[in-house]
Amino acid sequence: MSKLILDKLKVLRPLIKSKGLPCEKYGVVKDGILYFGNGFIQAEIPIEIPFNCCIDLYQLETVLRNVKGESVIINKDNKVFVHFDETDYNIETLPIDSLNHTINFFNAQTSVKCDESPCIFKWLCGIAEGYVQPIGNEQNVDFLCETLIIHNGTLVCTDKYNIIQGILDFNMPTMALPLSAIIFFNKIKKEDIVGMGLVNEFLLIEFVNGLKFYMPNLAHNQIERIITTYNRLVGTLDRVWEAPNIEIPVLVKEQINLINKISLQNAVFFNNTFCRAENSEIHYPSFTNEPFIFKCLYRNLKVALFWGKYFKTNEKGMSFLSESSLIRGYIGKVLDD
């Protein structure tokens, strides 16, 4: 039993803190389902604990991981113990209703099953963590730069200077996802997704390991506003984006990544024959006869180099396109050198 429980706790480990508020480290077991909610996201997974309780998940996982051998979890005198050999390890608990303000006990079913895991949704969530800004005012969310927007079969986000858009490989409704939820999703997204659905104001994502993950959908009751913001973003991208036609060789990408490592400067100058950052300079064979020159922040360039296959620059920015043509983006604020 202990190994089965430990396997489930390992799934939630990236979400759980060792210290902090009770909602950040405790979970509630009800009828064989473990529920966790920290005020930003919610998660639930079947677990082999045969009684209901509100339990310190970090403490439980730590004890089970360090006990050498098979153990059992018992409820004795309204306390929870991990019993091993002749030793009982007491695990801290709270009253069963202590987390009712941060947990909705949905145990919902996904309305749409995924024959294949939606990879582009995962990829773009990873990219969006560097684009989407934290919400400054909960009462007046700036959907333009404080959410990842999904609409019309695509996903788009911006940091006001750079824009990236992806064509989804799975049909999803109109949504706006905040940075806080994206960060937690990126911590646990390694497993394949097998189902999705909308549950009240949440996007439900079900993974192959049995985990159900709920991300707050800020588009709930805000659909028209989200669509207007989406159209504004995509319209801006259409206006500044130029069809890329220059392929940057892997060797050149490697040199740009290298010069960032040996330089303390955030900005990288880059053209078709060399790259420069601070006092460091690396030369490579010319890869195009077309004008190709710019300077920008490396953190923005890094995303383009990783996902982009084809590129085009002008006096204001750089457009890039993935090999599959499913992801495109634009880096603004390119500086002359």
Residue ranges of each PLM-predicted region?
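Structural preference for solvent-exposed beta-strand-turn elements
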Residues: 1-337
